[in-house]
Amino acid sequence: MNKLLPAFALSLSMLGASFAAIAEVPRTAAPENASVYIIEPKDGATVDKTFTVRFGLKGMGVAPAGVDAPDTGHHHLLIDLDQLPAMNGPLPATENVVHFGKGQTETELTLAPGKHTLQLLLGDKNHVPFDPPVLSKKITVTVK
């Protein structure tokens, strides 16, 4: 049994290193001067419980996830995030990181009453943020 323990420990460490290597994927270079922004609502707006968020993009095009076309990506809406997600792998799909992998440029959003922050982050065909990140200004809305 004691002879198996070092081999088991080595196997676990190699497995962990493999997962770390898989988690970090190459990032696509962003075109110079590419920018993403929220068209609507405006920063500081008061909105109804359900409201429209419209996405804007300059210097790049929008394409669905999985489409390998130069200088294109798709939107991810960051909701109430204090810290940006990791930029070295695919963005997680959570209630705070909403994927628009079909190439959508707007959405209807329903949030609880109160203050909320919204920010856009463009992802490549694999949901990986560009390098450097194409990230909008964070806006704040108040839901009535």
Predicted feature residues:
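Internal, hydrophobic beta-strand segments that form the core of beta-sheet-rich folds
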Residues: A112-H127, L135-V141
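A glycine-anchored, Pro-Gly-centered beta-turn/N-cap motif
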Residues: K49, G73, A112-G114
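Short acidic/polar inter-strand loop motif in beta-rich domains
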Residues: L84-M87, G123-D131
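Bacterial N-terminal signal peptides
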Residues: A7-A17
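Short amphipathic, basic-aromatic surface patches that mediate peripheral association
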Residues: G56-V67
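Short, well-structured beta-strand segments within conserved domains
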Residues: F51-F55, T105, G114-L122
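Short coil-to-beta strand junction motifs in C2/discoidin
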Residues: V67-H75, L135
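Short, compositionally biased P/S/T/A/G/V-rich stretches that sit at domain boundaries
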Residues: V25-D48
